[in-house]
Amino acid sequence: MRTAIPLAVLFTTLACSLASAPAHARARVFVASYGNDMNPCTFGSPCKTFQVAVNAVDAGGEVTAIDSAGFGPISINKAVTITSPDGVEAGIVANAGADAIDINAGSSDAIVLRGLTLDGAGTAHNGIVFSAGGSLTVTNCTLQNFAFDGSNLPTGNGILMQPTAGTLAFTITNTTASNNGGTGILFLTSSGGSPSVNGVIDHVVADANHFDGVSVDSRFTTGGAIVVTVSDSIASNNGSQGIFAGNGSATLKVSLDNVTVGGNFFGIVASTPANVLLGRSVITGNGTGVQNSTSPNTFYSYGDNRINLNGTDGYSSLNTTFITH
């Protein structure tokens, strides 16, 4: 015998089900110059700012700029892709004394930034600050005009990676970091950090930054392992070092392949505990070409580099006992 369900019970059950059902999934959302942050961030009704769109998108989803405009600074705490298609210039002009993009996400979260132009306007602190997350990919981006503030270190950087622990992978490709008051791309762990890091910097230009072009500085580490490959890239016209690797207690390995380093005060500088492998590269027009203070000598040159026409070349300090295995 079948018992009918009273209508009141049916309506109550349906109401509870609807209340507990998840909101409509938004795996992809949109921003546009004509958008409104009260909109649902769909293609037909886009939002106005990146921050509202990032808040609206599902974890692991994508935020896409429909047209060229400035879309405001962002704080990211989940996996997300933020992209600007070819022909669209999605900009972020950061606020004075602040960062354009701050990332503090979960240990397995992947963050992808593609086709963005970040400008500090001579007053903002940093372009991208990565404090926590699983991976960071920066592709086809421009980071410029961020300001060094001597009372707030580190500032003035195009990209600042400062993880304290955990495992991090980063890839920076086809990107330019220029005219920043600090360093173009700076890896500098927070105090007491011991992260495990695997990074790639490829087809990158770090030019006319006040301090360094690319710096892998493990001075605050108490352990961990950092492996970074720099390939097919240019570090030029930087006020201090074109490329730096060293300091701290982490196991630090930096491979430099087919890089051009010119017009810097120092071309390439390495200090203990860095292991540096240099091949197929041109170091010229610097005040000092290479400066090696690793002990024991772990700055290896493979005989296929052109270290010439610097104020002081410095190549005699390199380890030419070639590693062949």
Question: Residues of each region from the PLM?
Answer:
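Short, T/G/N/S-enriched strand-turn elements that build extracellular solenoid repeat scaffolds
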Residues: 51-57, 70-78, 82, 101-105, ...
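Right-handed parallel beta-helix/beta-spiral solenoid domain characteristic of secreted/periplasmic
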Residues: 79-127, 142-151
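Extracellular beta-strand/beta-solenoid scaffold signature
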Residues: 94-104, 121-130, 151-164, 179-193, ...
